[in-house]
Regions:
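Bacterial N-terminal signal peptides that target proteins for export
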Residues: 1-9
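Bacterial N-terminal signal peptides
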Residues: 8-17
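Non-catalytic cap/lid and distal C-terminal segments of serine-dependent acyl enzymes
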Residues: 23-30, 34, 40-69, 74-367
């Protein structure tokens, strides 16, 4: 009798489960199931897509967008696609704007809380490509207390392969991002770690530590934070050569403005200066800025102490080109020894990656 009851209960349970399964609606297959949100085509164009069937408007923004040229989307079956021609190899941040709301690519494995990264590298042989067959350095996020700003801040620190097991003291490059970015920019979209790893593995650069501080604050306060907080932190926590001949500063765009602020406020503290797509703040009178920074007196001090002072631009299409020209004209007037370079890729991360590639090969080699 007990066996019959147990069998009846089992059969009833099985029938109920089949009934529930039959009543559960099957999910409808949509184009989103097979959608690849970023595609690089053989002709060098890149297509960015998002599934938004109920959206009224969708747009795309990112580092790879042609300057001043909006891209009109094509919508089909709820998929909005944007085709961008002639995308240079590189890493690009991007996001969609759906009915006025920022949306970070839900299909991308690189999407974080506030960004998505598209890697366009068809050959895998670019100077910034990741090479699995070489030693790799370490990238650390370091937190420090800024007495200058009265708050906790972060910086990224790249140390070369073998640093942890070594004993030698190394020179330091302080590498600053541009406006609207943070210390995250150079290691991600700027591919700094891969560029440095490749150069070191090929014997093209001096082993060094590269510090990428957060420049997203008032320019004059950044200079104070760098000198009073960032550099002392590095020199207390890493094996570094703590003298001007083994200390370099470099920054792009807004970071270039900060670079000039740093060197003219501290003309005897850095042996190498690279200002990338930068100049003096375009919103201020350059003569007043020259007076504030005492550039005429400090130029002589810089000439005596600095082994290399380089100004770069991304060519006439670089939005800081005029600002750079103004700075160069002033430097000519005051007798500052500097070198000028142009990379014809505009105000883009492709330009600045080339700059870092060139710069890193030259730093700390002059006697």
């Amino acid at each position: 009798m007990r066996k019959i009851i147990a069998l009846s209960v089992a059969l009833a349970t099985l029938l109920l489960s089949f009934s529930a399964s039959a009543q559960q609606p099957q999910r409808r297959i949509t184009p989103n199931d097979t959608l690849k949100s970023v595609r690089v085509l053989p002709d060098g164009s890149a297509v960015f897509s998002i599934y938004a069937p109920k959206a009224r408007t969708v747009s795309l923004t990112g580092d790879m967008m042609p300057w001043g040229q909006p891209i009109t989307p094509v919508e089909k079956d709820g998929v909005w696609s944007f085709s961008i021609p002639n995308v240079k190899p590189g890493s690009y941040r991007y996001h969609f704007i759906v009915d006025g709301v920022q949306v970070y690519d839900p299909k991308s494995p690189t999407t974080t809380q506030n960004t998505a990264l598209a890697v366009v590298d068809p050959s895998g042989n670019e100077f910034f490509s990741y090479r699995p067959d070489i030693p790799h350095g370490a990238l650390a996020v370091r937190t420090y207390w800024s007495k200058t700003l009265g708050r906790t801040r972060t910086m990224r620190v790249w140390t070369p392969a073998g640093y942890e097991a070594g004993k030698a003291k190394l020179p330091v490059l302080y590498l600053i991002h541009g406006g609207g970015d943070t210390d995250v920019a150079w290691p991600t979209v700027g591919c700094a770690g891969d560029i440095l790893d490749n150069l070191l593995a090929d014997g093209k650069m001096v082993p060094m530590i590269v510090v990428m501080p957060d420049g997203s604050c008032d320019i004059s306060m950044f200079e104070k934070d760098l000198m009073a907080d960032v550099i002392p932190f590095i020199e207390s926590n890493y094996r570094v050569l703590a003298d001007k001949d083994h200390r370099a500063v470099s920054g792009l765009s807004m970071g270039g403005i900060e670079t000039l602020e740093v060197i003219f406020q501290n003309p005897d503290k850095f042996g190498y200066v690279w200002c990338l797509s930068g100049g003096f703040n375009p919103g201020v009178d350059i003569q007043k800025e020259a007076e504030r920074l005492n550039v005429r007196t400090n130029a002589a001090i810089i000439n005596k102490n600095c082994k290399e002072f380089v100004m770069t631009q991304g060519g006439p299409t670089d939005i800081t080109y005029v600002s750079g020209e103004r700075a160069n004209k002033l430097f000519d007037e005051i007798g500052l020894n500097y070198e000028y370079q142009e990379v014809g890729e505009g105000h883009t991360w492709y330009t600045w990656k080339i700059n870092l590639y060139d710069e890193a090969q030259r730093l700390f080699k002059k006697k």
